[in-house]
């Protein structure tokens, strides 16, 4: 709960819970199976040494055809910059392309979220679009950058 309720860690997120009950409700809405079109599926990121939840990774299964999805990642402040997001994303992308046979994976990023931009670029995603003022977030209109990668481009 601590990293998900931290406003600084989640300043680019749409979900910043104020109470533990909100987390319980969010988890209860999570589908029980992965790869259901139109749903978000959340995975937790656990630090092996401490067995502590340090972040999460969301997968949005887009459309009815099942060939595309969107990824997003949140890491606690004290664990950022240590490679956890990169490792979790690589494992998840491998699974999505090689096990679930996805064709394309995207990421939607606020242009001010430099860490996420660097993460997606490090993973060899390409910048596909920059939409001006198309998301209403935290009381104001913000831009959105879309990154994408095809299965045929994934080399990890």
Where do the language-model regions lie?
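Conserved G/P- and acidic residue-centered "switch" motifs that form tight phosphate/ATP-binding loops
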Residues: 51, 83, 113, 139
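Structural motif
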Residues: 7-8, 100, 123-124
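Conserved catalytic-core motifs of GNAT/GCN5-like acyltransferases
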Residues: 106-108, 126-144
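Conserved acetyl-CoA-binding loop-helix of GNAT-fold acetyltransferases
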Residues: 75, 81-98, 114-122
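GNAT-family acyltransferases
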Residues: 1-78, 140-156
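Conserved phosphate-binding and hydrolysis motifs of nucleotide-dependent enzymes
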Residues: 55, 113, 124
């Amino acid at each position: 709960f601590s990293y998900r309720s931290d406003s600084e860690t989640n300043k680019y997120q749409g979900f910043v819970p104020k109470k533990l009950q909100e987390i319980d409700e969010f988890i209860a809405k999570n589908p029980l199976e992965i790869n259901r079109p139109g749903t978000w599926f959340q995975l937790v990121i656990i630090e092996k040494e401490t067995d502590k939840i340090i972040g999460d990774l969301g997968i949005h299964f887009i459309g009815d055809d099942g060939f595309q999805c969107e990824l997003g990642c949140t890491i606690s402040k004290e664990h950022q910059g240590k490679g956890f997001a990169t490792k979790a994303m690589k494992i998840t992308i491998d699974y999505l392309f090689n096990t679930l046979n996805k064709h394309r994976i995207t990421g939607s990023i606020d242009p001010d979220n430099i860490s996420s931009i660097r993460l997606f670029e490090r993973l060899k995603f390409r910048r596909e679009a920059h939409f001006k003022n198309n998301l209403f977030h935290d009381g104001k209109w913000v831009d959105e950058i879309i990154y994408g990668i095809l299965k045929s481009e994934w080399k990890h």
